Each structure stands twice: as structure tokens, then as C-alpha cells.
Regions:
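Cytosolic juxtamembrane helix and N-cap/initiation of the first transmembrane helix
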Residues: 1-23, 147-148
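Canonical alpha-helical transmembrane segments
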Residues: 54-70, 76
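C-terminal TM-helix exit segments that contain a strictly Trp-centered aromatic cap at the helix terminus
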Residues: 33, 82-104
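Non-cytosolic membrane-interface motifs at loop->transmembrane helix junctions
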Residues: 41-51, 75-76, 107-108, 124
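Transmembrane alpha-helix entry/boundary detector in multi-pass membrane proteins
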Residues: 14-15, 33-57
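Alpha-helical transmembrane segments
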Residues: 18-29, 134-142
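Alpha-helical membrane-associated segments of multi-pass integral membrane proteins
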Residues: 104-150
Length: 154
């Protein structure tokens, strides 16, 4: 293993670099989630789910990335797949158990003229589709884990 970080980075496959970028995105999402959930964390247990998952993804995913060729890829795939569950639960909780109605509400805003709120006060409810960010991170991560390249050696 290279001791120089630049050499180490250059030795990584494209897939490993993509996973590293996704983990960086998860770090930013964790910081944003902590800020956005600051009040609700004291009110309900399920507000902790995305923070716990993002922290697990960073710590477990970072360790797994270092062992990419020795089982780390499979661990990362499982962690990224878990993101789909967390995203779905988040949409469920953000919508108060009525995801279809809230998704319809989000999509119907395209019919509103710019500058109008459609009768919904900004900040009066959690953003229904925000948890789908975990679907995006999970999708990119899974593609990187399941796409084989010549540099991966497996």
C-alpha cells in the first residue's frame, strides 16, 4: 500500500473513486441533515434514522473502501442498498404516512406561476421528497460496486 496519498489515490480504480465521492456526498448530507433535523431530533425517534444511516455509511463505508478487494465491495453494496430503505422510510415519515398525496402536491407545483405558494406555507411541513437523496447516493454507489473494470481485478 502506498504511503503517499497522491500515489494511493492514483492506484484506486474508477469505481473506488466514485465510491469515495459518494461517501463525500454522504458527509455533506449528514451535516445538512443534522442542521435540518435540529428541532425534530428531540421530538421523535425516526428523525435519527437518516443521521444514523449516514454516519454508518461514512464509518463503515470508509473502512470497507479500504478493503475494496477483500470483501469491502460487498459491504459497500449492502450499505448503499440500505439507503433505499432509509429513503423510503424518510418519504413515508415526511409525508405523514401519505406519500402519494405529498408527491402529487410536490409535482402539482409545476402548474403554479413562479412566486406563488399554492396555499402551502414554506416550512410548514417537511420536504416530502428530500429523503430520496439517499436513493441517489445508493444508486450511484451500487453502480460503482457492481460494475466491473479491468483495474478492479475481479
Amino acid at each position: 500500500m502506498a504511503t503517499n496519498p497522491v500515489v494511493w489515490w492514483r492506484e484506486r480504480s474508477l469505481n473506488e473513486r466514485v465510491v469515495a465521492a459518494v461517501l463525500g456526498g454522504a458527509a455533506l448530507l449528514l451535516a445538512e441533515l443534522r442542521f435540518e433535523h435540529r428541532e425534530v431530533l428531540g421530538e421523535t425517534w425516526h428523525a435519527w434514522l437518516p443521521l444514523g444511516y449516514a454516519a454508518l455509511l461514512l464509518v463503515g463505508g470508509g473502512a470497507a473502501l479500504l478493503r475494496w478487494q477483500r470483501g469491502g465491495r460487498r459491504i459497500l453494496a449492502a450499505l448503499f442498498a440500505l439507503g433505499f430503505v432509509i429513503g423510503a422510510l424518510g418519504i413515508w415519515f415526511h409525508s405523514g404516512g401519505h406519500p402519494v398525496a405529498h408527491v402529487w402536491s410536490v409535482l402539482s407545483t409545476w402548474q403554479l406561476p413562479p412566486g406563488q405558494n399554492g396555499g402551502i406555507k414554506v416550512g410548514s411541513q417537511p420536504p416530502a421528497l428530500a429523503p430520496a437523496a439517499f436513493w441517489g447516493l445508493g444508486s450511484i454507489g451500487l453502480i460503482a460496486c457492481f460494475t466491473r473494470t479491468s483495474h478492479d481485478g475481479t
